[in-house]
Regions:
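Structured binding/interaction patches within domain cores
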Residues: 19-174
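Short, extreme N-terminal leader segments that mark the start of a protein/domain
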Residues: 1-30
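Low-complexity intrinsically disordered segments
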Residues: 161-198
């Protein structure tokens, strides 16, 4: 049986799966901010609880992320703004439809950020090229995707597959490990680009 596409997995996920999927996308993009804090830790801690602690932990994460500064150039400022928007857009209500919309938006934003990093500082992709690549990724046909966006797509799929198995805290820990791997990759890319631009 063929694997499900990213769009299909998001459409079938429950509240916890959607919240964790969006959160994981956001976490993998954090190296684009020059911050040593872990603004999403409280949200990860509260995911197993579900609706009860979500609004308060979300507010705490927003406050922490608001103080994180981008690395200091125009491109980084744009990425930082997108990351903050991803968290600001998270719904306070623990309901499947708003969470699905948020998870979907986070998926697109994370893929877009990785696609722009694939292009490099001198090769900003056109809007039409970005749309084409993202559409292919989400529908299971990433034919023109670079290595970073391909790896991010693979992690998004893996996260949703883990969450679909419904293994509670064990599954959430597995998801965090996947996201930590993605963070390490992106942090190395950001560090390498910073050295080149000096």
């Amino acid at each position: 049986m063929a694997s499900k596409s990213l769009r299909e997995l998001i459409a079938q996920a429950d509240e916890r799966g959607l919240a964790a999927s969006g959160l994981a996308c956001l976490e993998r993009c954090l190296p684009l901010l020059a911050s040593e804090t872990d603004p999403l830790g409280p949200l990860w801690d509260g995911l197993a609880e579900g609706a009860e602690g979500w609004p308060g932990r979300l507010a705490e994460a927003r406050d922490t992320l608001a103080g994180a500064a981008p690395p200091g150039d125009g491109e980084a400022d744009g990425a930082a703004a997108l990351i903050r928007h991803m968290l600001d857009a998270a719904p306070d209500d623990w309901q499947v439809e708003p969470l699905r919309e948020w998870a979907d938006d986070c998926s697109v934003a994370a893929l877009e950020l990785h696609h722009r990093l694939d292009a490099g500082p001198a090769g900003e992709p056109t809007a039409s090229a970005v749309i084409e690549v993202l559409k292919g990724c989400r529908e299971g046909e990433p034919t023109h995707a670079g290595p970073l966006v391909t790896a991010e797509l693979r992690r998004q799929l893996r996260v949703l597959e883990i969450l679909a198995q419904g293994e509670g805290r064990i599954g959430l820990r597995q998801v965090q490990r996947v996201s930590t791997e993605g963070q390490r990759v992106l942090r190395a890319v950001v560090s390498r680009r910073a050295r080149v631009q000096r």
